Amino acid sequence: MEPLPLENEDNQLNSNKSTTVSSKNFSNIFHNNIHNKDVVGLTDMCFLENVEENELMNNLQNRFNKDHIYTYIGEQVISVNPFSNKANIYTEQVLKSYQNMYMYEVSPHIYALAQDTYKKLLLSKESQCVIITGESGSGKTEASKIFLNYISKVCSGNLENIQGIMRLIIESNIVLESFGNAKTLRNDNSSRFGKFIEIEFDGKGSPISGKISQFLLEKSRVHSRAIGERSFHVFYQFLTDKRITSKLGLSNDPTQYKYLKDSMCFSISSINDSKDFQKVLESLKQLAWTEQEMESIWRVLGAILLIGNIEFSNDVEKSNVDAVYISTPETLKKVSQLLQCSEDSLEKSLISRSLTLGAGKRQSSIKVLLNQTQAKETRDAFSKVLYDRLFTSIIDKINSTISSKSNNGSNYIIESTIGILDIYGFEIFENNSFEQFIINYSNEKLQQLFINLVLRQEQEEYLKEGIEWKTIDNYFDNTPIIDLIEGQPVGLLKLLEEACLIGQSTPELLIQKFNQFFSKNKHFESFETSNNLSIESQSFTLKHYASPVTYNLDSFIYKNKDPLYQDLIFTMESSKDKFILSLFNKDFQKNSLGVKKIPITAATQFKNAINDLIGKLNTCQPHYIRCIKSNEDKRSNHFDYEAVRHQVRYLNMLETIRVRKAGYCHKQHYTRFLGRYKMISKETWPFWNGTPKDGVMAIVRAASAIQNSTSECQFGKKKLFIKSASTLFHFEELRQKILPSIVITIQRVWRGYKVRKWYKQELQRLREEKEEIQKQIKRKNSANLIQTYYLRYKVLTYIKKLKPWSVGPHYNKGHIMPTLWLRRTPIDSLMQSIHIIWWAKVKVTSLSMEARSLVRQKILALDLFGMGYSRKKEWDCRRKFQADYLSDDSNPKKSQFSESVQAMFQKGGDKEILFADNVIKINKRGKSQLRSLIITDQHIYKYDTKKYTQKKVGLKLHSIVALSTSNKKDTFLAIHFKQPIRDLYIDLGCDFVEKVSEVCTNLVQQVYKLTGTTIPLVFRDPLTFNNSRDSRNNGTDFVVSFSQYPKGKEQRQSTFVKGKGNTAIVYYNLD
């Protein structure tokens, strides 16, 4: 268990030497905490021996003097404002010491109530609310901050999200304090509006969003207040920022603004406006305000201050009417610039108003000029509405930022809420107006709620449940005052509403109405109905639960109407600033059809709002912080006995103590109690089949066997009532002792269940998988069988289609083969290639060896010279390669040729003639010579054509390194040899037949056989060859270019013509 902070004589919370408390020794600590009154007073005033006013006051004073500002009345926290900083009781260590503790295990503190609130929210899943009441200056706002701070630190769940939501809610408090709080005569930081903060939680107890509702902003404070008071803090704060004011063209001096200087109070010793404004700026950024939106806010605030500086003077030129004109045009111009609206339109709206006459088709509008008083009232009303709508838009923006949609989308469900109500305290001033009437009315409603929930309803519940009870009815019941104010058909508010509907109603007529209906009401007094001379003729006194208050009716009607002429609304609706335009985008004085309707008065709006709030509070489980002002002078650590006594009386503290002391500290439905504590009794654990009440009785009997609890418990019809907190703690102790063994049992059973469930699921899964695998195998086998037969059918079909390509003599060559059924283009192309190869093999196989050799030569020639678009040189692929052109009958010297060949074979060892024909050889001087060229399997021979005598030695074929020719239609060929052999350049077209392809094919083929090397065939233009060598074997290259015969000089045979130097031209014919 967490350490228990005990109270001692020196410190309210001994956080330095905290004692660890277990459930076993709690009763001793509880007893010491209660009865240690000689040192610090009673922590819980329900334990007063004599419930008398003096005893209660002495206990509060004793604790206050020892720096113990918090005291319990049951589960309520009484907080006495010391007007000093008690930082030592709000440290992080102190806060942690309250976590997971019960209220009476720890010293009185707001932290204890916050922990109790949060714990009940977790256990019951019911919405909770904290109602903070007390006079103005009693510390309500600070109490709400302390409560919020504790909730933000103890919530569980998604830490990042929680810190984000709670941080935003806390940041919003800083903004709302700046815009909604002000200095009054009784309080330096008085809330001038009521707010209800709702923190929304999910099922795990994690805050997921928030919502803020506000009630009755005291907007009249913008333009008027008592001497010594200030307007809202934000006006003084933003004037401290020179960067903003200089940008807006405003003065930093608050005395320059009429709205601020009238009350003659500009600064407060306890508040640093500049430092606080920096916090406001940071909070606005955290709450997703953009720089542009913040700039619009400062412009609206600046405009409001300058509106107060607009002055009016009587317009003497309009002598027949009481009219005015604006005597400060520069100020008006600056206001229009800040609001980004038409200066002319704004001026007309301030000094005149539009009045609608007639209805329907006869409806018309006229301009009515305003007098001095009316113009000032319009000016002030304009400033009030501007600030009111600005404040409302700020709250709307905060709500949109902290809402569940902004932070969590639809992933979370709101299970319950904690509401924190911080509303005006009871106010009594020297001059009490409409605002004080409404504020005190709201406090009456809250006091009535407290009476109903704590005093009346609790006693009524005891009687309803059949619990023996002696009724306590000597508390102050404020129901008659509530009826007086809001009664139907006649009440103060009802008569005020009627007066507002009558155009000529005055305070005198209104007080007459009040006297007429309420002169005999004991809670109402006026000048005419009483002998109290302090009450003026236009005033009345209400005897509130806190104190009698006299109200001045002088401005009741005007403030309740809260008028704003349509002209000003239309002017604002034309603003170019989107933010300002959004403040006036809904004209509240017209219905959806655009027809003017009767505006709802301020009192009616607040009455509806406070009744809605009371209805919402009634649905929550309430918790109370009762704030008491220690003195009226705001003196530090000073206890004003009489001032505190007065507050104790009207807060009904004595009656609350009597009800708590005589009553029961805890009550719970039998079903819920049985569900939480049934493990205490073996009869009810783990199952109970009887009625819930009998089950609870069995639990109480089991607890009484350990500690006498029977006398502490009373059994109602539907609920169990427990007398003291120690008994409730006893039940909780027993539950905590048994829970570990139950947890182990539950874990064991749960784990066994999980394993068995897993085993069954796994077994079922394996069975299903087995069945599925078997099905898949069967399905796959069937599919394979179907595929086999199908493929067999498709193959046979395809083979039948291929039959024309397998039957001679042409085998359908040149036709596209049928495509496969698979539509695979690469396979189709491959089949086409395979067929061509097969066709070639069939054709070649039927040929003789000689024919095969010729075919191979043709194929090689095709590779060397190409065909079609890839043809490299013109050649005749259809011509038969004859090889020996000199042994046929066309050669007259056939016999001489044959004899020379025989001699050559014998001498040189050659075995085969690859090519023999007459050619023209180019000699080393570039001259053409007719020679017989014989290419054998080993050599190249050159013979004289006349006698067939050999010219020089034969050239070995394996010495050839390359062949070159042009890509033209000439018949010349260069055969390149290894050095020092000079190249051979010959013309193979002597008989006008192209034989370059045949010679090249033979040479390439034979050199490959001899050397295993493929000599290159190069197509060049110009072509270079080595034609001669000197004694040092230095070659002389000829460069041959190619050209067509000049026109008119064409010849059938190509001609070699030597040019200058080592150049030459070969002429050829295109045909």
UniProtKB/Swiss-Prot annotation:
Q: Name one Pfam family in it.
A: IQ
User: What are the IQ domain coordinates in residue numbering?
Assistant: 739-768
Annotated ATP binding sites: 134-141
For this entry, the protein name equals Myosin IF heavy chain
Myosin motor domain sequence ranges: 40-736
Q: Where is the TH1 domain?
A: 870-1069
User: Which BP terms in the Gene Ontology apply to this protein?
Assistant: actin filament organization; actin filament polymerization; actin filament-based movement; aggregation involved in sorocarp development; cell motility; chemotaxis to cAMP; endocytosis; lateral pseudopodium retraction
UniProt function note: Myosin is a protein that binds to actin and has ATPase activity that is activated by actin.
Q: Where are the transmembrane segments?
A: none
Q: Which family does it belong to?
A: Belongs to the TRAFAC class myosin-kinesin ATPase superfamily. Myosin family.
Keyword set includes ATP-binding: yes
- The entry's keywords: Actin-binding, ATP-binding, Calmodulin-binding, Motor protein, Myosin, Nucleotide-binding
Actin-binding: annotated segments: 610-632
**Does DNA-binding show up as a keyword for this record?**
no
InterPro entries reported in the protein's UniProt record: IQ_motif_EF-hand-BS, Kinesin_motor_dom_sf, Myosin_head_motor_dom-like, Myosin_TH1, MYSc_Myo1, P-loop_NTPase
Q: How does it assemble?
A: Myosin I heavy chain is single-headed. Dimer of a heavy and a light chain. Inability to self-assemble into filaments.
Highest taxon of the source?
Answer: Eukaryota
Gene Ontology, cellular component aspect: actin cytoskeleton; actin wave; cell leading edge; cell-cell junction; cytoplasm; macropinocytic cup; macropinocytic cup cytoskeleton; myosin complex
Molecular function GO terms recorded: actin filament binding; ATP binding; calmodulin binding; microfilament motor activity; phosphatidylinositol-3,4,5-trisphosphate binding
